[in-house]
Amino acid sequence: MAAKEIHFSDIARGELFEGVKKLADAVKVTMGPRGRNVLIQKSFGSPSITKDGVSVAKEIELPNTVENMGAQLVKEVASKTADEAGDGTTTATVLAYNIFKEGLRNITAGANPIEVKRGMDKAAEAIVAELKKIAKEVKDKKEIAQVATISANNDPKIGELIAEAMEKVGKDGVITVEEGKSLQDELEVVEGMQFDRGYLSPYFVTDTEKMEAVLENAYILLYDKKISNMKDLLPVLEKVVQTGNKPLLIIAEDIEGEALATLVVNKLRGTLNVCAVKAPGFGDRRKAMLQDIAILTGGQVISEEVGRTLESATLEDLGQADRIVVDKENTTIVGGKGDKAAVEARIKEIKAQIEQTTSEYDKEKLQERLAKLAGGVAVIKVGAATETEMKEKKDRVDDALAATKAAVEEGIVIGGGTALVRAANKVNLDLCGDEKIGAEIILRAIKAPLKQIAENAGFDPGVVANNVENAENENTGFNAATGEYVDMFEAGIVDPAKVERVALQNAVSVASLLLTTEATVSEIKEDKPAAPAPDMGGMGGMGGMGF
């Protein structure tokens, strides 16, 4: 076991702070409409250019182990915010850094970290409650386009594309982003279905960068029981191999033991391009969803209830689809080869069930099934001139899409960091002592995103924050793109309420953990010995060189 180094109290927190500062300094330059790009060296290929906070944070590893721990914790804030809300990673990082900085100052001066943490949590809770009150529901295509435009770094074309995609498949529909083949961005709506079950083994992955299994022009086997014995599965696998080894997706209650191990081995050897996932849903709902997939893909559910065994399955029982994408959590089936009339009949049947049911839960689940069958999948194909530009643009479209979904979920608030300031100004907590100090830390740090946006645009952050706070109209904020104070809703500068909420909650969570840290334990980095000098023994003949 390697030797460890232990640091205590102010020294420990000081080193953690240095790490947090270094990460925040690299991330915060990307913030706002006039934020700058960050160039990231890759271990192979050309460097990547990004203005996405989480992409920058993910690349940062610091040589000092204690500083690196601080940086990694704040990196987690950015990643978690991106996972939950799809955007707001830079906001979360800037907030975490400023809360930690303000808190550290007070704790060094003698405040009790635990009491300070309590005050911080109470203030954050109160701000979140105010954000929910001022959030405005997203009603039309124009508002959706505004949110998407802001999240795509003020690219109105991407905003329009996402708004159009949402209009076509509905807010419950599935929208995926792919790399296009041309210079133009394109929108394609494909009949398809997505359900929340991912691959049973990462060895099924075909695209290691995205960690996805992509099956083109594939067969689909649907079985309503567990598969653990390989001999039951063998006859149908042999038939698939005889067709020219088309890819196969197996959907069953579960696949385990010998069956799963054999499938993985055959996949790795290249004998069979296969992927296995669990069937979606539970109980009767699982049977209904398997039947939905069967109708959509033109297959049959192999079920002992109708006298069919897995051994008796034929190629005619298998469904077919143009493209199947399976990641860790979801399976998307695009271009199912099912009969259109049968799909329409199934949709009518589900609609009738929705009208008849009295249970809200059942109604919600039926509507989900309806969206999967009727909504289809919208595919946004991103176009660009170079691979570097393509990656950067695709990241922006992914961000914008996630932010738009968040906006539809919890509504929108005025953007540019203004909503947090407005919500904080309405908070009135009756606290005392160190708890009050904790609350004040949050209320001061909450202005950091607004100030950072102003600073990146070349304006005095203090003056801008003061002008926004003292504005008569509650919707007045700072438009960093033009340098004007405007009605943010009218100007279309909006943020999803969920993004602001999640960014604040995650930032407070990590900053309070850092502030209550009293010791750090880290490995001592040993300097690697220099490589030995090459042996010069073979040069003995040079002795006769007299000068």
From Swiss-Prot:
Alphabetical keyword list: ATP-binding, Chaperone, Cytoplasm, Isomerase, Nucleotide-binding
Subunit annotation: Forms a cylinder of 14 subunits composed of two heptameric rings stacked back-to-back. Interacts with the co-chaperonin GroES.
Subcellular location: Cytoplasm
One Pfam family this sequence matches: Cpn60_TCP1
Catalytic activity: ATP + H2O + a folded polypeptide = ADP + phosphate + an unfolded polypeptide
Source organism: Nitratiruptor sp. (strain SB155-2)
Protein name: Chaperonin GroEL
InterPro entries in the record: Chaperonin_Cpn60_CS (IPR018370), Cpn60/GroEL (IPR001844), Cpn60/GroEL/TCP-1 (IPR002423), GroEL-like_apical_dom_sf (IPR027409), GROEL-like_equatorial_sf (IPR027413), TCP-1-like_intermed_sf (IPR027410)
Positions of region (Disordered): 528-547
Function: Together with its co-chaperonin GroES, plays an essential role in assisting protein folding. The GroEL-GroES system forms a nano-cage that allows encapsulation of the non-native substrate proteins and provides a physical environment optimized to promote and accelerate protein folding.
Record-level GO cellular component terms: cytoplasm
Molecular function as annotated in GO: ATP binding; ATP-dependent protein folding chaperone; isomerase activity; unfolded protein binding
Biased composition range(s): Gly residues: 537-547
Family to which the UniProt record says this protein belongs: Belongs to the chaperonin (HSP60) family.
EC code(s) of this entry: 5.6.1.7
Biological processes annotated in GO: protein refolding
SUPFAM superfamilies for the chain: GroEL apical domain-like, GroEL equatorial domain-like
Binding-site positions, ATP: 30-33, 51, 87-91, 416, 479-481, 495
